[in-house]
C-alpha cells in the first residue's frame, strides 16, 4: 500500500513539515520551494483494511515548534486491496473557530451520533471527499449534490449521503471512473426522518478540476468545512453542588445516585447542562470545616460522602441495617447538611460493608483493572488518609514517620500481608465504588443528551497528597488568594500553596495534563476556577491573613529609581504600617486606649506608633485572638489587621530592592496622609503597574501553559474570568476558544454598573449568580438603591422597585438571561426556583452557599424540596420548558 501525503505550508528558513502519528518518530516531508510538501511511504495493510491516524507538525533542528490542531487526529481508512495507492491532499488545520462543537460535550452528548454509519466501501478508482460539520444532530446527516448523475444532477432528492463514521468529520467515497470533470457540488443538510434536504450551503459551488486519478488509486480531499444558515445552537442548564441534592433516599447529603435523578429533571425541563462544584476528598479533621470543597487533599480521589450507600450493597445484619435506615431519615429531614453526623454515619456503614463485601470486591476483575489504571494516585491517597487519622493530623510534616514521602516504603506498607493493609484497602474499596457510581451517572447523562460540567480548583491544600508526594511542583512558602474585588474588600486568602511553574514547564506540565485527563473520564465540560491564576496568581506572605499584602506572581516589580521616575519620592517608611494618633479612634472607638496600651508603642516621631513585638504580623495577631469570638475581640482583631496592612509598598519576595504598590491602598490612612501631588504621582504609577505594565508579560505566561492544557482533552473549556482582569485575558481566551463567564452584576465593562445581556459574546456562559454570591432574591434585598437602579434602567420599569423579588420579576430576569447571546445560560437551582411562588424557599438566607469574605464558611446548603417533588411539579416544569423553547435554547437541528 502506497500513501502519498501532500500539504501546502509556507515555511521559514530552517523549518520542515513532518508527519506525526504514523510511527514512533515523525516522518520527514520534502519540498522544492518551501511551500508544497510531499511524502510517500509504504504500509502493510491487512486484507480487512486498516484505519490510520496522523497529523502534521513543524520542526526546526529536531525540535517541534508548531503542531496543527489535533484534538481530532486525521483519520483515513485504507482498504485491503493489494497494490493500492492513496493520494492524500490536506490543508493545515488551525484551531477551529467553533471549537466548542468539537468538544466531547457536543460529540458525546448534545449532538452525539450514537449509531454511526459504517465506513464507505472503496472503489478501484476512488475520490474521497471529507468535510467537518459538527453542528448536525443525530436526526440529520451531511450530503453532497452536484453537476452530474453521480452527484444527483443538482436534484436534492438524489443527493449522495455522507458517512458519520468519524463524526464530526463526514466522508463519502465516489466511484471516480463514473465522474466527469470539472466537478461542481455543494454540501446539503439532509433530514433522515423526513428523507428530504432541508438546507443548502450558501457559498459558491465547490469546484474540482480533473485530478487524473489512476486505476487502483484513491484521491482523498479533506479539510473542507460545511456551514448552513440555521439558528445558532444555544442551551441552558442548572448549577448545583452534588452535596445540595436531596432525594427521598439521600443520606443527609447529595450523592452520585441523586445525580441521576437530577439528570432526569434536566431532561424533563429540556436543560442540557448540570454544573457542579468540586467533588474531591477534603477530609482533614473530620470536622465541619472540611466542608470547603476547594480545599482538597487529593486532586483525584472523590469525597467518600458522595457514595450512594444503596449501590454499595445491603448489610446482612437486619437490625444494624434498620438502624441505618432510621438514621437516614433523621439526617435527610434536616434543612441543612450536618457534615459531621453525615460523614460519621457513612463511615460506620463503609467499615461494615467493607468487612462484609470487601474481599470479594477487591478480588474482582473490575477492581483489579481500576487499581492498575489508578495506582499512581490511589495508593498514596489511601496511605495518606490512613496516616492522617493514625497521627491525628493532615499536616504530614508533623508525622513521626513518613513525613517525607518514600515510594518504596509506602509500597511495602501496602502489601496485603501487612497489618496496615486492611485500613488502606478500605480506601481502595470506597474509591472504586465512587468511580463506578460517577461513571454510571456520566454514561446516563450522555445517553440522555445532558452534559456534566465539573469544576477544577486553581489550588491544592498544603496538607494534601500532592504536597506530600510532589512538593517540587509547589511553592510552600506562600499562600494563593485573590486581590480585593466585589467578593471581598480585603482580598481573599485561600491558604493554598502556589505553583512552581518553572518546574512544571520542564516536564511539559505533566501534573496538569494527568489531572485534566482524569477529569475527562467523568465530565464533558469543566470550569477552570480562577483562570487568571494561569496568567498570574495573587501570592500572600505566610505572615499575612488578609489578601491586601500580596503581590502578583510572576510579575515585574519596580525599583526605587523607577518609582521616583513618576515624580514620587520613595521612602523606607512606606514599607512599614502607618499608625497615627489621629485615626485610632475611628478604628477602635471605646477600645482605643486598650489597643494603645496592649498592642502599640510610640516611636520617636510625635503621634506615630508601631506594633509591639509579638503583634507585628497579622498571623501573630490571629494567634493571640484564637478562640476569642466575642464581637469586641473580633472588632479589635480586625482593626489590628488593617493597621498592619496600612503600607504603601510591598517588597518583592524574590528581588531585593524591588517593590509593588500595595493593592487598594487608596482607601487607607497612609495614602490619605500624602500630599496631593504625591497622591497624583502614586496613582499614576499604580495605574501603570496594575493595568498596563504586565499585559504582554502575562499574555506570554498564559500562552506557555493554557494551549497544552486546554487541548489535552476534548472537554468543553469554560473559564471563570471574574475579578481584577488584565487586558490580555480576553485575547488569550479568544485565541484558545475558551468560554468566558458573564454575570450581569459583575460587568466586564468598567463603564457599566450592570452587564448588557445583548452584548454578551456567543462564546460565553451567562448566569445570574454563582455559589460565591447571593442568589437573585438575596441580591435584590441587599442594596435597595442598587436594586432600584436595576429595576428602572435594566428592566425598564417605572416607579418604586418592590422590596422583594417577586416570582414575576424573577421570571422576567430569568427570561432575559435565556434570551442573551451566550451559547450556554446556566442558572443556579435557587434562581430557577425563584420564578415559582409556591416552590421557592420562603427563607432566602438559607439559599446562600458561600460567603467568600468568611474563611470559616460552612458549606451546607440543601434543596428544601426533594428531587421526587421537583419531578412532580408539573406546572413549574412546564413553565421552564416553555421559557427554554421560546428563547431558542432547545434547537431541533
Model-found features: residue ranges?
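Aromatic-rich carbohydrate-binding modules that target alpha-glucans
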Residues: 2-51, 59-79, 133-181, 190-213, ...
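C2-type phospholipid-binding modules
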Residues: 76-91
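Catalytic cores of glycan-processing enzymes that make or break glycosidic bonds
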Residues: 97-124, 128, 175-178, 208-893
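Intrinsic disorder/low-complexity signal
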Residues: 67-69, 89, 307
Amino acid at each position: 500500500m502506497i500513501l502519498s501525503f501532500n500539504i501546502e505550508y509556507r515555511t521559514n528558513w530552517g523549518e520542515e513539515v513532518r508527519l506525526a502519528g504514523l510511527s514512533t518518530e515523525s516522518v520527514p516531508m520534502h519540498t522544492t520551494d518551501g511551500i508544497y510538501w510531499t511524502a510517500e511511504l509504504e504500509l502493510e495493510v491487512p486484507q480487512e483494511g486498516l484505519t490510520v491516524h496522523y497529523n502534521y507538525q513543524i520542526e526546526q533542528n529536531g525540535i517541534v515548534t508548531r503542531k496543527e490542531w489535533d484534538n481530532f487526529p486525521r483519520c483515513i481508512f485504507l482498504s485491503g486491496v493489494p497494490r493500492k495507492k492513496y493520494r492524500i491532499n490536506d490543508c493545515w488545520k488551525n484551531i477551529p473557530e467553533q471549537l466548542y462543537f468539537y468538544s466531547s460535550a457536543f460529540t458525546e452528548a448534545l449532538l452525539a451520533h450514537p449509531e454511526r454509519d459504517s465506513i464507505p466501501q472503496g472503489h478501484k478508482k476512488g475520490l474521497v471527499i471529507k468535510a467537518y460539520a459538527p453542528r448536525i444532530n443525530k436526526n440529520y446527516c451531511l450530503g453532497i449534490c452536484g453537476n452530474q448523475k453521480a452527484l444527483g444532477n443538482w436534484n436534492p432528492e438524489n443527493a449522495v449521503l455522507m458517512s458519520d463514521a468519524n463524526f464530526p468529520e463526514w466522508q463519502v467515497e465516489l466511484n471516480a471512473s463514473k465522474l466527469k470533470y470539472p466537478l461542481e457540488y455543494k454540501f446539503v443538510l439532509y433530514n433522515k426522518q423526513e428523507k428530504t434536504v432541508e438546507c443548502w450551503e450558501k457559498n459558491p459551488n465547490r469546484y474540482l478540476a480533473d485530478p487524473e486519478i489512476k486505476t487502483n488509486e484513491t484521491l482523498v480531499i479533506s479539510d473542507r468545512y460545511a456551514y448552513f444558515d440555521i439558528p445558532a445552537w444555544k442551551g441552558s442548564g442548572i448549577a448545583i453542588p452534588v452535596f445540595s441534592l436531596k432525594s427521598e433516599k439521600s443520606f443527609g447529603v447529595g450523592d452520585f445516585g441523586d445525580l441521576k435523578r437530577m439528570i432526569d429533571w434536566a431532561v424533563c425541563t429540556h436543560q442540557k447542562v448540570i454544573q457542579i462544584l468540586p467533588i474531591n476528598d477534603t477530609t482533614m479533621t473530620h470536622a465541619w470545616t472540611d466542608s470547603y470543597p476547594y480545599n482538597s487533599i487529593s486532586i483525584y480521589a472523590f469525597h467518600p460522602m458522595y457514595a450512594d450507600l444503596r449501590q454499595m450493597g445491603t448489610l446482612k445484619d437486619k437490625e444494624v441495617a434498620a438502624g441505618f435506615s432510621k438514621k437516614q431519615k433523621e439526617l435527610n429531614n434536616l434543612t441543612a447538611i450536618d457534615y459531621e453526623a453525615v460523614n460519621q454515619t457513612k463511615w460506620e456503614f463503609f467499615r461494615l460493608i467493607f468487612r462484609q463485601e470487601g474481599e470479594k470486591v477487591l478480588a474482582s476483575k473490575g477492581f483489579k483493572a481500576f487499581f492498575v489504571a489508578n495506582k499512581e494516585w490511589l495508593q498514596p491517597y489511601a496511605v495518606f488518609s490512613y496516616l492522617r487519622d493514625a497521627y491525628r493530623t493532615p499536616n504530614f510534616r508533623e508525622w513521626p514517620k513518613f513525613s517525607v514521602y518514600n515510594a518504596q516504603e509506602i509500597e511495602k506498607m501496602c502489601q496485603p500481608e501487612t497489618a496496615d493493609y486492611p485500613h488502606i484497602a478500605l480506601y481502595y474499596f470506597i474509591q472504586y465504588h465512587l468511580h463506578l457510581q460517577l461513571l454510571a451517572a456520566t454514561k446516563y447523562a450522555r445517553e440522555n443528551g445532558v452534559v456534566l460540567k465539573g469544576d477544577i480548583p486553581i489550588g491544592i491544600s498544603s496538607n494534601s497528597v500532592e504536597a506530600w508526594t510532589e512538593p517540587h511542583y509547589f511553592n510552600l512558602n506562600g499562600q494563593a488568594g485573590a486581590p480585593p474585588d466585589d467578593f471581598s474588600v480585603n482580598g481573599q486568602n485561600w491558604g493554598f500553596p502556589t505553583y512552581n511553574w518553572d518546574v512544571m514547564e520542564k516536564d511539559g506540565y505533566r501534573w496538569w495534563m494527568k489531572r485534566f485527563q482524569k477529569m475527562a473520564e467523568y465530565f464533558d465540560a469543566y470550569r477552570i476556577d480562577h483562570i487568571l491564576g494561569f496568567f498570574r496568581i495573587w501570592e500572600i506572605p505566610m505572615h499575612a491573613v488578609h489578601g491586601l499584602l500580596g503581590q502578583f506572581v510572576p510579575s515585574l516589580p519596580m525599583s526605587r529609581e523607577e518609582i521616583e521616575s513618576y515624580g514620587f519620592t520613595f521612602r523606607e517608611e512606606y514599607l512599614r504600617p502607618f499608625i497615627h494618633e489621629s485615626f485610632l479612634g475611628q478604628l477602635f472607638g471605646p477600645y482605643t486606649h486598650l489597643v494603645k496600651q496592649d498592642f502599640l508603642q510610640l516611636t520617636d516621631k510625635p503621634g506615630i506608633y508601631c506594633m509591639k513585638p509579638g503583634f507585628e504580623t497579622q498571623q501573630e495577631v490571629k494567634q493571640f485572638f484564637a478562640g476569642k469570638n466575642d464581637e469586641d475581640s473580633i472588632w479589635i482583631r480586625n482593626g489590628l489587621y488593617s493597621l498592619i496592612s496600612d503600607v504603601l509598598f510591598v517588597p518583592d519576595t524574590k528581588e531585593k530592592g524591588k517593590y509593588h504598590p500595595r493593592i487598594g491602598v487608596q482607601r487607607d490612612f497612609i495614602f490619605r496622609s500624602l500630599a496631593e501631588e504625591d497622591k497624583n504621582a502614586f496613582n499614576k504609577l499604580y495605574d501603570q503597574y496594575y493595568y498596563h505594565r504586565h499585559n504582554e508579560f502575562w499574555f506570554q505566561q498564559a500562552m506557555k501553559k493554557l494551549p497544552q492544557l486546554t487541548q489535552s482533552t476534548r472537554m468543553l473549556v469554560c473559564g471563570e474570568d471574574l475579578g481584577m482582569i488584565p487586558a490580555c485575558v480576553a485575547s488569550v481566551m479568544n485565541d484558545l476558544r475558551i468560554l468566558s463567564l458573564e454575570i450581569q452584576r459583575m460587568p466586564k465593562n468598567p463603564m457599566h454598573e450592570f452587564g448588557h445581556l445583548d452584548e454578551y459574546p456567543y462564546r460565553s456562559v451567562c448566569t445570574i449568580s454563582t455559589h460565591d454570591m447571593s442568589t437573585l432574591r438575596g441580591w435584590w434585598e441587599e442594596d435597595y438603591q442598587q436594586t432600584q437602579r436595576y429595576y428602572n434602567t435594566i428592566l425598564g420599569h417605572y416607579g418604586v422597585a418592590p422590596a422583594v423579588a417577586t416570582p414575576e420579576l424573577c421570571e422576567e430576569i430569568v427570561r432575559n438571561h435565556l434570551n442573551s447571546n451566550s451559547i450556554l445560560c446556566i442558572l443556579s437551582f435557587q434562581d430557577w426556583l425563584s420564578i415559582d411562588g409556591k416552590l421557592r424557599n420562603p427563607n432566602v438566607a438559607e439559599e446562600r452557599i458561600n460567603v467568600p469574605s468568611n474563611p470559616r464558611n460552612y458549606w451546607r446548603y440543601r434543596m428544601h424540596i426533594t428531587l421526587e417533588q421537583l419531578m412532580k411539579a408539573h406546572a413549574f416544569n412546564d413553565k421552564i420548558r416553555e421559557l427554554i423553547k421560546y428563547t431558542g435554547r432547545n434547537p431541533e437541528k
